[in-house]
């Protein structure tokens, strides 16, 4: 038995300089697991609740001392003596202890830090790398990275409404090569932006945030960079968008400031997205509609769902109850998986499994406020998810995940598998 003998929570900083929760879990054998949780900028209204102190005299009210105290008192008392290898039982203990639907009493940030740290400790105890511990011998598939090279929306101070413009190396023969392709396009893009006299400063997720005239201009910059780096857009490197449409939905209309204040109905906005998909090699669109606009989602899915991956992030918030409703109604064809949206590893894996059974893809994702913790890299391989979103090719909080995936690919050796375009099995 891998008995838990000590738990220590602490307040540390994330990549934006805001406090977040870190947890150490010590086992009887002397083995320790450590994990730190991320935090989002644009969040879904039905996400599990991240507990913040609200004390304006510390960190502008964003301190997490209450969440840390919950780890060091209540949670510690409840889990000391439990077997760290019983992840499901441990997570259920945390959920029952919290007693709310949205983890608002203890805080999803406190619960997730413990859940992740326990898994790390148990993996260490078993002598297995985390991805193998989580997924077993069948965990051999590396994820296709969706690399956020231009930022807009809530992640940048420019005129772009859409939050992320991504490159997807679908034609790469391996994960290592996919990362190289992405890095080379990133550097080509930096040169193009610089040569146009625009800022090459990067946003929260490591992508550039140039002030361009409209969204198509941003797409065209990326296409130029792909070509300049020596690759073929579409065949080798596809494009993805994260609209984060809940952020520009006002009074039932989609208001695009970056398109001159254009106000569009869901049907008109779908038409615009469809026209971009016809013109450019876009194979994935995330949060194309407001999280509450299920009629809009239905229009979008019926129009584009056969040949474009439509990812629900704010829509599904990694929640099986909401995902099941979406599957039943034929809404979207993919779910974004953010561990802190739901608050435990067990519930995260349940959402991935439900998506796969329904023929939906599951895209493992970072948050805009990250740490050096690379657990999501191991989750991506451990669950054979096939896709990961973990930012651009800069900032060590993003690179930490790419580097961990490079190590995993090396560890797997000849049995490592990079799916490329096959990761988009929801498209026909």
From Swiss-Prot:
GO cellular component terms, A-Z: cell surface; extracellular region; phosphopyruvate hydratase complex
E.C. designation(s): 4.2.1.11
Record field: catalytic activity: (2R)-2-phosphoglycerate = phosphoenolpyruvate + H2O
Residue positions of the active site: 205 (proton donor), 338 (proton acceptor)
Cellular localization per UniProt: Cytoplasm; Secreted; Cell surface
Source organism of this protein record: Acidovorax sp. (strain JS42)
GO biological process, one term: glycolytic process
Keyword Metal-binding: yes
Primary localization: cytoplasm
SMART domains: Enolase_C, Enolase_N
Origin: domain of life: Bacteria
Alphabetical list of Gene3D superfamilies matching this protein: Enolase-like C-terminal domain (3.20.20.120), Enolase-like, N-terminal domain (3.30.390.10)
Required co-factors: Mg(2+)
Name used for this protein in its record: Enolase
The keyword Repressor belongs to this UniProt entry's keyword annotation: no
Signal peptide limits: none
Cofactor note: Binds a second Mg(2+) ion via substrate during catalysis.
Positions with a binding annotation for Mg(2+): 242, 286, 313
Keywords, comma-separated and alphabetical: Cytoplasm, Glycolysis, Lyase, Magnesium, Metal-binding, Secreted
């Amino acid at each position: 038995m891998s008995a838990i003998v000590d738990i220590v929570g602490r307040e540390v900083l994330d990549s934006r300089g805001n406090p977040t929760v870190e947890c150490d879990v010590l086992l009887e054998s002397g083995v320790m697991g450590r994990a730190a949780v991320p935090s989002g900028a644009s969040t879904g209204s039905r996400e599990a609740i991240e507990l913040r102190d609200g004390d304006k005299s510390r960190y502008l009210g964003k301190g997490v001392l209450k969440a840390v105290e919950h780890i060091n008192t209540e949670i510690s008392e409840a889990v000391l003596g439990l077997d760290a290898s019983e992840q499901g039982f441990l997570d259920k203990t945390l959920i029952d202890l919290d007693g709310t639907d949205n983890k608002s009493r203890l805080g999803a940030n406190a619960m997730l830090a413990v859940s992740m740290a326990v898994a790390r400790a148990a993996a260490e105890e078993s002598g297995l790398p985390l991805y193998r511990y989580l997924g077993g011998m069948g965990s051999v598939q590396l994820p296709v990275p969706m690399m956020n090279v231009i930022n807009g929306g809530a992640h940048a101070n420019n005129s772009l409404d859409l939050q992320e413009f991504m490159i997807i190396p679908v034609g790469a023969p391996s994960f290592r090569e996919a990362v190289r392709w992405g890095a080379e396009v990133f550097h080509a893009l930096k040169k193009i932006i610089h040569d146009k006299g625009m800022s090459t400063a990067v946003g929260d997720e490591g992508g550039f945030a140039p002030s361009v005239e409209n969204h198509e201009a941003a797409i065209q910059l990326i296409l130029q960079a792909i070509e300049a780096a020596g690759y073929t857009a579409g065949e080798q490197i596809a494009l993805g968008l994260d609209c984060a449409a809940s952020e520009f939905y006002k009074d039932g209309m989609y208001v695009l400031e970056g398109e001159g204040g254009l106000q569009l109905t869901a049907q008109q906005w779908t038409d615009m997205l469809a026209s971009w998909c016809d013109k450019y090699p876009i194979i994935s669109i995330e949060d194309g509609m407001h999280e509450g606009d299920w009629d809009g989602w239905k229009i979008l899915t019926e129009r584009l769902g056969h040949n474009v991956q439509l990812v629900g992030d704010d829509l599904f918030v990694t929640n099986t109850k909401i995902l099941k409703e979406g599957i039943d109604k034929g809404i979207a064809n993919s779910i974004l998986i953010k561990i802190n949206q739901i608050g435990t590893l067990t519930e995260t894996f349940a959402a991935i499994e439900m998506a796969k059974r329904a023929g939906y893809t599951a895209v493992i994702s970072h948050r805009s406020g990250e740490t050096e913790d690379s657990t999501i890299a191991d989750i991506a391989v451990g669950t054979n998810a096939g896709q990961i979103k973990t930012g651009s090719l800069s900032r060590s909080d993003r690179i930490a995940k790419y580097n961990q995936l490079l190590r995993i690919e090396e560890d797997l050796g000849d049995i490592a598998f990079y799916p490329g375009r096959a990761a988009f099995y929801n498209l026909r």
